[in-house]
């Protein structure tokens, strides 16, 4: 188990992690939040690339801030931006990474690398330099390097940003096949990634873990409370943002479709619609509802 207790991290006046508490068991956990929420700071801390100012992080009962090698030997990490040796082929680079991870048996390395390259659909490109890969291919290669050594903890940070829909789906399919016996943390600002993949999730904003629960539980929390209306006048939209709990606005054929959170109909012209995960996400992120009725209070 991975246990994060009362963790803080500051960069000058910025409180990047503010009293984070989170326990994770094997399975896929999605961490949603806008850019600047503190997600990458948390991921880098879990990967032992930096230490918290306060609090403890334990992995299977061992404090990783004091004994980082305990988690490093079990970790697969795909950061938001990762560099490669520009002239090395995918095959050679994975072999190099495998050696760094402690896989000394050449035959074992060869078998693992071949299996992973086939799994991420890069086997036919094994002799090509990784620097020549497209964005989607690089991300799939990133998954392969993260899975070398059969890690029990996998951290992926903003993995689908910039990918086209097909590459995004390929990536999520690979991640979903990584194994139910591993703790997999998917940190992203893309709501669909969590919706499509995770059975457990958290919402992070301004350095705090605002809420943690199953996606369907967060959706159920506001069921029957999301109303929508097409508004033609921009001034009316601006006023609604002041007067109501506006979840989202989007332009549609010259007008603005406004979605609001309300326990009952706000009035004439408003229509009740099915709740989506993004509604629950914005409701918690904007402080329209608290986490007190969720399964896991942050």
Predicted regions mapped to residue ranges:
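Walker A (P-loop) phosphate-binding loop of ABC-type ATPase nucleotide-binding domains
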Residues: 34-38
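Conserved ABC transporter NBD signature motif
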Residues: 55-66, 70-71
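Helix-to-loop junction immediately C-terminal to a conserved catalytic motif
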Residues: 47
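Conserved ABC ATPase "signature" region
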Residues: 95, 99-102, 107-125
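A short, proline-enriched helix->beta-strand linker immediately N-terminal to the Walker B motif
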Residues: 148-152
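ABC transporter nucleotide-binding domain
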Residues: 170-259
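Catalytic Walker B motif of ABC-type/P-loop ATPase nucleotide-binding domains
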Residues: 154-158, 163
